[in-house]
């Protein structure tokens, strides 16, 4: 099957062109779905994923019809009920919205299962409107399912799922024996293991009931990589790795899939009391800790820090640099992670570094409240999709990074990302840009997401010395509720308490520009953080610019705090039930900024 990739820049350009050539009414009621496609590696011998663009205005759209070989096979909503772990939480969110306050998202994906191996299929999609009419067909996607792969079960090489046997060698032998296109099956059971090394052209499949449990022995995670070539610190391997010490270039590895209904557990921290989620399901929770308490709260985290300190490393550096993440894929061209549950990393969850054409679909992230327990991070990577996932994370949920300081100018930006149909619970931020912004974070579209209990909806953070920044950011058609802090923060005052990376300060300071936030509802936040907070450093001529906020409803939030901003607009933002003060607007030093067409005078 041909791998289909995409450019969000071209997709956005297409939407803009359509709006320019059509009246708003026609665009809202008659447009067929655009850019129907199959995400990278999201297919196998019996199924295929479909995703498509939605227009900027989705207010008149109720669903999408899915057609296979010209025959209607169902609705996107019904399909997501069956296949998306995010959908039940999204449905519960709207069920509780009795006042109909929130923006209604639309579902723009479907999984077609029950297909025959090695068989040609054609797919189209139609929009369903509120009046019951439908659009014309989308573009047609023609594809061929793969052949049935060779399957190797790790128990064939002696792996034992008893929760105590160390299976590193047995599982690695199974991976090494896997021919091109092979699938490695992990059956039901708890398979304890140290670092494993994936290779090109393979699928790792964790069956229902399977758990890969990280060893708690620091020696089982050898030195593996530097986060950037220009830093001195070396990090240990993750539990699952595609890393080559001699090359981080895109294409060093190709075509890696990690799929299945099983669990990847990093064994990083002790558990605290479990919680119940919105559906009544048990949620594992982990002890909130830091570098001063890791010896008491950690498992693998404790042992890795202790091992590093024993060699003479100071505790802060050991804590920052010597804890393993769960999954690190570096230099990979074409990667797909789907359906697995991610738990309890000693450090971060999933990391895609210097990779392209990477997709996360229907992953459940359960890392709350593990310190630094990000959900998924994209570092200097391009052509990214994240959809249908559920995030309950100890740090940022989806994070973009792009190097630090002057040397980052030699790196590629993180670019072309599309984030949609996700459900975000706890986290320090749902969609996060930075703090490592050196090479730039460019062209990110986050749409049709639901966010609740997270600290921040859209979080852009850096510091002048890091350089770069982010631009071409669109955050739209989403709903937020019960935020711990605020809806949006853009700041150059970020400082990482655990940060020990050595880098040369950038000659050109970081800044953020060309942001669009549109068609978003925000209901209730705790604390006193401004609902929208924007700060640069105008005293040093560091301005953010070209921000457009429009069509937002905010209730039960604190007033805004906006400074160091130029050439920007705030249109049709309605506030109710302010937590403090009588005016929602608080401006510092700004220039050429308007609210509903009126120039702001600080």
From Swiss-Prot:
Q: What is this protein called?
A: Exo-poly-alpha-D-galacturonosidase
GO MF entries: exo-poly-alpha-galacturonosidase activity; polygalacturonase activity
Q: Which organism is it from?
A: Dickeya chrysanthemi
Q: Which segments constitute the Fibronectin type-III domain?
A: 32-149
Write out the transmembrane intervals.
none
Q: Tell me where in or outside the cell this protein is found.
A: Secreted
User: What does UniProt list as catalytic?
Assistant: 395 (proton donor), 428
Return the EC number: 3.2.1.82
Q: Which reactions appear under catalytic activity for this entry?
A: [(1->4)-alpha-D-galacturonosyl](n) + H2O = alpha-D-galacturonosyl-(1->4)-D-galacturonate + [(1->4)-alpha-D-galacturonosyl](n-2)
Q: Name one GO cellular component term.
A: extracellular region
Q: Which family does it belong to?
A: Belongs to the glycosyl hydrolase 28 family.
Keyword list (alphabetical) reads: Cell wall biogenesis/degradation, Glycosidase, Hydrolase, Repeat, Secreted, Signal
Q: What class of enzyme is it?
A: hydrolase
Could you tell me which CDD domains the record lists for this protein? FN3 (cd00063)
Q: Where is the signal peptide?
A: 1-27
Cited InterPro entries = FN3_dom, FN3_sf, GH28_Enzymes, Glyco_hydro_28, Ig-like_fold, Pectin_lyas_fold, Pectin_lyase_fold/virulence, RHGA/B-epi-like_pectate_lyase
Give the record's GO biological process terms: carbohydrate metabolic process; cell wall organization
Source domain of life: Bacteria
Any idea what job this protein has?
Answer: Contributes significantly to bacterial utilization of polygalacturonate and the induction of pectate lyase in the presence of extracellular pectic polymers.
